[in-house]
Curated annotation (Swiss-Prot):
UniProt keyword Kinase, yes or no: no
Extra facts: Gustatory receptor-like proteins are divergent proteins which do not belong to the canonical gustatory receptor or olfactory receptor families but display some structural similarity. They are predicted to be ligand-gated seven transmembrane domain ion channels.
Membrane-crossing segments per the record: 14-34, 43-63, 73-93, 127-147, 162-182, 252-272, 278-298
Coiled-coil residue windows: none
Lineage of the organism: Eukaryota, Metazoa, Ecdysozoa, Arthropoda, Hexapoda
Compartments reported by the entry: Cell membrane
Organism from which the protein derives: Drosophila melanogaster (Fruit fly)
Extracellular topological domain residue ranges: 35-42, 94-126, 183-251, 299-371
GO MF term (any one): ligand-gated channel activity
Protein name as catalogued: Gustatory receptor-like 65a
């Protein structure tokens, strides 16, 4: 098997860096055991995450309790705080399941590497998606800094700095949980992409056998049996990838629901009366579009029909024909769609949400100008 190339080495280090930051922020409660080559729960990180959660809850309760006298003006902050707190609690309670899912993903990735005959699962497009996820995180934090600095005269300099740092830490912990979800989806996209390459390789081998002059020779039948066995392994591997994808989508559906609500809040509450407010709305829309793009890419990569279009050996071997039919049947019934509580996150829903959000932002702008 070939060695890990520079691109894959950098991508793996980038993913481990994201995990390290989540551990520092008290989001992740698991560590990677290099000897056992698996993830495991850490009692210290779980205790540390609980302390961070308690501090976060106290900070949000104190800050929101002082705003109830003017709830009509600050309700977006209250709702956003509740969303962040609920997501953190949900993540801590479900931390054992995410460790199980991560270990299953590691086992599947090793099987895919064996099928592909090389350890280089990630390609440049997957690294770019990860970098875009990091860019969205940093861009959201930078926008908060801009809005807070714009209203810095409401506090003295020291108090404003402390509050700004706490707000950034709270927001960072929430954005890191969404970023972890995106990273897992990108890994699944890379896995499906590698399965495409394996399928095309089998397809090309079958095309070469189809052009063989003697289709009844013993050597030919041995090669057909070998390809049939490889195809059956591909079927089982694709089933495993499909099931782990469904479990990950189901596990994080509550996180995605909260992320969508949090991303839409500015359109219902913020008035684009200056450049900072307008930039915040644009960045919120871009973040939602990027998340939907990840969903669309995952749904598209889970389809393998285009990789099977050149399987022509089925006319010469009935058992191979049944194997290919099983793979095609699996393709028809096992297509990934990202759903949350029965609602499919497709482009139609995205267009509806963005249209409603743009209308609300326009109405808020008109009310501000009228006042």
């Amino acid at each position: 098997m070939r060695e890990v190339n520079l691109l894959n080495r950098f991508t793996r280090q980038f993913l481990f860096l994201i995990v390290l930051v989540t551990q520092i922020c008290g989001v992740a409660t698991f560590v990677y055991n290099s000897k056992a080559q698996c993830f495991r729960q850490s009692g210290f990180l779980r205790f540390y995450s609980s302390l961070v959660l308690i501090f976060l809850a106290l900070f949000l309760i104190v800050t929101t309790s002082k705003m109830f006298h003017n709830l009509q003006a600050v309700w977006p902050y209250v709702v956003g705080s509740v969303i962040i707190l609920v997501v953190r609690i949900h993540g801590l309670l479900e931390s054992a399941e995410i460790v199980e899912l991560l270990n299953q993903m590691l086992r599947i990735m090793r099987q895919v590497n064996l099928m592909a005959r090389h350890p280089n699962l990630f390609r440049l497009k997957h690294l770019l998606l990860l970098l875009l996820a990091l860019q969205n995180l940093l861009r959201s934090l930078n926008t908060i800094v801009g809005i807070s600095n714009h209203s810095a005269e409401a506090y003295d300099s020291f108090l404003n700095s402390v509050i700004l740092l706490i707000i950034l830490a709270v927001l960072l912990s929430f954005l890191l949980q969404i970023t972890i979800n995106i990273c897992l989806f990108v890994v699944l996209i890379a896995t499906y992409s590698e399965l495409h390459h394996c399928t095309r390789r089998i397809s090309n081998d079958m095309d070469k056998l189809r052009l063989h002059s003697v289709h009844e020779s013993g050597q030919f039948m041995v090669l057909v049996k070998q390809l049939q066995g490889i195809t059956e392994k591909l079927i089982r591997l694709r089933q495993n990838v499909f099931h782990i994808t469904v479990r990950i989508i189901r596990h994080f559906r509550f996180h995605w629901l909260c992320a969508i609500i949090y991303g839409l809040l500015p359109f219902f509450s913020l008035t684009a009366k200056d450049q900072n407010g307008f930039n915040f709305l644009i960045i919120s829309a871009l973040n939602i579009i990027f998340q939907w793009t990840i969903f669309a890419i995952l749904s598209r990569e889970s389809r393998i029909t285009r990789s099977l279009c050149t399987f022509h050996l089925t006319n010469y071997h009935k058992e191979t024909a049944r194997t290919i039919d099983e793979l095609l049947h699996q393709e028809i019934w096992e297509r990934i769609t990202v759903t949350i509580y029965g609602n499919t996150l497709d482009t139609k829903l995205l267009f509806k949400l963005l249209s409603i959000s743009a209308f609300c932002a326009f109405v808020n702008r008109l009310e501000y100008l009228h006042i």
